[in-house]
Amino acid sequence: MRRPPGNGEAASEGPGGWGLWGVQESRRLCCAGHDRCKQALLQIGINMMALPGGRHLDSVTLPGQRLHLMQVDSVQRWMEDLKLMTECECMCVLQAKPISLEEDAQGDLILAGGPGPGDPLQLLLKRGWVISTELRRIGQKLAQDRWARVHSMSVRLTCHARSMVSEYSAVSRNSLKEMGEIEKLLMEKCSELSAVTERCLQVENEHVLKSMKACVSETLSMLGQHFGQLLELALTREVQALVRKIDASDNIYTTESTTGNLFSLTQEGAPLCRIIAKEGGVVALFKVCRQDSFRCLYPQALRTLASICCVEEGVHQLEKVDGVLCLADILTDNSHSEATRAEAAAVVAQVTSPHLPVTQHLSSFLESMEEIVTALVKLCQEASSGEVFLLASAALANITFFDTMACEMLLQLNAIRVLLEACSDKQRVDTPYTRDQIVTILANMSVLEQCASDIIQENGVQLIMGMLSEKPRSGTPAEVAACERVQQKAAVTLARLSRDPDVAREAVRLSCMSRLIELCRSPSERNSSDAVLVACLAALRRLAGVCPEGLQDSDFQQLVQPRLVDSFLLCSNMEESFV
């Protein structure tokens, strides 16, 4: 099941550490002094295993996404790896360099399946990932002063770098002069690293080793920078070739294949998405979406656009080519398939994500907002599957953050009735991710006074009460986080709606106060979430102001009467046995 684009949660970011091929968050090598050197190495790298979300869609960061998963039999994977493993070790032997026999030696080289012949793009991604892994591990061993391991891994790094350069040169077109210069610098630094680490093996004086360690760190940093520059140039060149192919093609099969390759690249992380946007990928894909002869390719092109627009550069390019107008045309045209309109909704959800500050300046979106919102509500109402409903509701949820007028539009379109009716349809609403979108819309609409009467009329208070009991089915971190968001937003919605005495009395009648007290006092009920606790305390205090008779004295004295921060501290420190 795909998960939707983010709608304003302070949700966790994607996998930390090494970016797919790009800049890593600043980590530090534990080498005394030379802070600049410590950080420079870890600014470049590839980690194919990070598997950033396909669309970078999350529920409020929306988890999102079609994950780029490779399900390959382990024996088959080992057979594919064997060629590169033996190649590397043979090169080490030819250079008369010993391979370490330390107990952790086998874990120092991690390889994915080998690229096919004549596939420069996959070759770059694979070799780049291997080299970045080696760089990271050399840094770790250097911090531990394990010089034998540092040296053997440096030799292996040189082998991989030489292989990447020679293999790419063999399958690529004429190399750029700039690439040749960087290749030369990279190999020089690799040789320098091997030589200096070999000398370190002969040194026993700690003071001398300390000074040499700084030199190794500096060399490693420069090597990482050259590697990153070379990889970016090579990937940019390959992306340019794909974009030109899409732009010039009038053959549906060629366009389908090339667009699929471009989509696969977007799954490798934000840095590659930036390159694709910069090199005209957004322009080329919207060109596809404006040609009737390519209508069957619209879903694939839109899916790729949604992934590219996870970065600001993609959104900028989308606005430059009037992409919002194109999306509005697709969403409002009933002749398009449901799948096409759902993918267009996914792009809307992505470009309106509150996590991208640039989306707040999409002036073109305001011009088409009414027809887009109307089309999305209709798509929610007619959705034939949970995935279609999820994408459409995620787009609506993000739009309610984007502009306050959207909430008034939704009220006029009877969106509350559409959403609440969908909650009883398991075919459309069957995951906490989808309920997260629904309760987000309700929470943002609840600031309008007219919303309360519609909620009561559609038995919405009972639905909100049910959301306070949202539980994960699988126990995965993403689903647990989604359930926490549902509980938190349900409490926020209840607190806002309880300004209306009728809503407050209905909530008390449905025992909402008892459930709120349970969430406050029992950490396991809220997965020990502080955000859920604060929201529940706020809702409980609002209800107590209208119907104080629904509280016992102990609950009033501990959860309502003190300052909010005092009640929070009391509940957050409670042991489970207290209940």
UniProtKB/Swiss-Prot annotation:
One Pfam family recorded for the sequence: INSC_LBD
Cellular location(s): Cytoplasm; Cytoplasm, Cell cortex
Motif, PDZ-binding: chain positions: 576-579
Annotated region described as Important for interaction with GPSM2, given as residue ranges: 74-89
Keyword rRNA processing annotated: no
Annotated tissue distribution: Isoform 1 is expressed in various tissues with stronger expression in liver, kidney and small intestine. Isoform 2 is abundantly expressed in small intestine and to a lower extent in lung and pancreas.
Gene Ontology biological process terms, A to Z: apical protein localization; asymmetric cell division; cell differentiation; nervous system development; regulation of asymmetric cell division; regulation of protein stability
Subunit description: Interacts with ALS2CR19/PAR3B and F2RL2/PAR3. Interacts with GPSM1/AGS3 and GPSM2/LGN (via TPR repeat region). Identified in a complex with GPSM2 and F2RL2.
Protein name: Protein inscuteable homolog
